[in-house]
Regions:
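Domain-level recognition of soluble alpha/beta enzyme cores
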Residues: 148-176
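Active-site signature of alpha/beta-hydrolase-fold catalytic machinery across serine-
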Residues: 58, 140-144
């Protein structure tokens, strides 16, 4: 059985790809390492964004493991232009999975991208995997396994957050393990 820990990054100093963790986010990354260290993680995979890589760095150092970077785990781009009412725009993309704004990515496309990354990891012979990504993409990946995940689930995510996907053959059980 594969246990895949889907991790939302710790608190960042901004939203762009290069934004680092805040000092509070750095402390959260240490707490995240304390938690994940006990779960039999053998493989670390991260979004290319700095905040995701910095969130898993303390665990990588402790376990002496490299962090694989997978661009499919990057956050979903909602729009090329900043949106004044971005929260409402995200809500609408959970209602209409094919809605796409100029320069953006639909929920359906982002979900397929994230799910492809997860399926590739599930196909590997590893018992425990920590995968660090971002809130919107994480919720869409969770939705690909359980359609009850939507806008409200996205709103309830914390920084960091951890969901466990326990896979055996084609069956996957989803459970929140961080703060649960």
């Amino acid at each position: 059985m594969t246990r895949l820990f889907l991790v939302r990054h710790c608190v960042p100093a901004g939203r762009d790809a290069a934004a680092p963790l805040t000092p509070a986010g750095q402390l959260q990354a240490i707490a995240l390492a304390d938690y994940l260290e006990t779960l039999g993680v053998e493989l670390l995979v991260s979004s290319p964004y700095a905040r995701a890589q910095q969130s898993i760095a303390p665990l990588a150092r402790r376990l002496g493991l490299p962090v694989e970077i997978d661009p499919r785990l990057a956050e979903r781009v909602l729009s090329a232009a900043p949106l004044e009412h971005w929260r409402e725009a995200i809500r609408r993309t959970f209602e209409d999975l094919d809605l796409v704004r100029p320069g953006g990515e639909s929920s359906r496309t982002a979900m397929a991208r994230g799910r492809a990354a997860i399926d590739a990891l599930r196909a590997r012979s590893v018992r425990g995997v920590a995968v660090v990504t971002h809130g919107n993409l994480m919720t869409l990946v969770l939705r690909s396994f359980d359609t009850r995940f939507g806008f409200q689930a996205w709103e309830r995510l914390s920084n960091p957050d951890v969901y466990c996907l326990e896979a055996e053959a084609e069956r996957v059980r989803v459970s929140r393990t961080w703060g649960a």
